[in-house]
Amino acid sequence: MSKQSQHVLIALPHPLLHLVSLGLVSFIFTLFSLELSQFGTQLAPLWFPTSIMMVAFYRHAGRMWPGIALSCSLGNIAASILLFSTSSLNMTWTTINMVEAVVGAVLLRKLLPWYNPLQNLADWLRLALGSAIVPPLLGGGLVVLLTPGDDPLRAFLIWVLSESIGALALVPLGLLFKPHYLLRHRNPRLLFESLLTLAITLTLSWLSMLYLPWPFTFIIVLLMWSAVRLPRMEAFLIFLTTVMMVSLMMAADPSLLATPRTYLMSHMPWLPFLLILLPANIMTMVMYAFRAERKHISESETRFRNAMEYSAIGMALVGTEGQWLQTNKALCQFLGYSQEELRGLTFQQLTWPEDLNKDLQQVEKLISGEINTYSMEKRYYNRNGDVVWALLAVSLVRHTDGTPLYFIAQIEDINELKRTEQVNQQLMERITLANEAGGIGIWEWE
């Protein structure tokens, strides 16, 4: 009898909806980037469309790439036509953007883990290399080669800088975004904290640009404060909005960078020392909290690992699609597989077919929140293909936003109990047959 497997099917939106959405997003960000150049400043405008295309390539299968390239390019062209005339269109630049996006997406896929692309500083450095260094340098080189001008060095630097800033501002956000992140903001506290931090950061950044010397130093402190207060996704969103606001202010009023604001320094000459101490103090406390939390997590993991590993009954952490994530020795002995072998299997493959449907029904109730735990007797295949009985107890661990993370399963060997029940049942059947054959009546007197 063949072992069966079960996969969770997720209904995805129609691909056409993806392409239309990408085209609209590309249109909006292209419009913003081109608006910066309308002010006639020497500031290299932020260029977001390449980063949008790069993220879309990274997140979608290769068969979608032609449609993504077409929809994003149409969004760019529509924004250009809206602000300028059709004669100003330069399809060479659009083609270079596509080349950069393809190269960046391929590099990001090679350099970053798929499920959680930004887990540490090393991942961020690889992201910067794959999106904000190599593709912009390649694009700048192609611009100089294919569209030579009077000042190729200036064109190269402006192109590289605008692409790099856009990538660092937008790509982390695009790589991290998952639909279930939006569910977190059903928590009023997180929503309020995120909006309050955004409002404070934008307001103080605006005031810094208008009235303070070295405004970017103050903005760095504000962004560090935002990063400390908020989760990763919300922090990157604040970084993006702050960069867009500040760039718009600089494009509208170039004198913001040229004005020394000596009047403030004459009253507060020691202000630079405050700027030295604030980031240092913030990072000190952040690192202390990080080390303390890491120590606490390590101790908790050690206690849990020991409790699981030395348990007399089988225990396992099971993914939401049925894969065995972690198993203890008792379970491995019960099923006859090693831990490495079990990681390549699912519980659906090892479950007796007659028990699988009932088990999956309970799993669905657990995921939907109808029940918190369930237990049942079920049969498994062991390594030799024999059927073994187990008492299964399952509970679900959820993320803070309520999304399921993994199951905790306790699997107790009840083979001996089932054999005893079978022997007792056979014995009672024999006694009943003997009594019927001998004409013996049995009754109870109270």
Model-derived features with residue positions:
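Short aromatic-rich membrane-water interface segments that cap or initiate transmembrane helices
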Residues: 153-165, 265-271
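Cytosolic signal-transmission helices at domain junctions
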Residues: 122, 285-302, 429
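PAS/LOV-family and closely related PAS-like sensory domains
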Residues: 213-216, 228, 234, 238, ...
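Sensory coupling linkers of modular signal transduction proteins
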Residues: 171, 413-423
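PAS-family sensory domains
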Residues: 286, 403-413
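Short helix-perturbing small/polar motifs within transmembrane alpha-helices
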Residues: 4-45, 51-150, 170-238, 246-252, ...
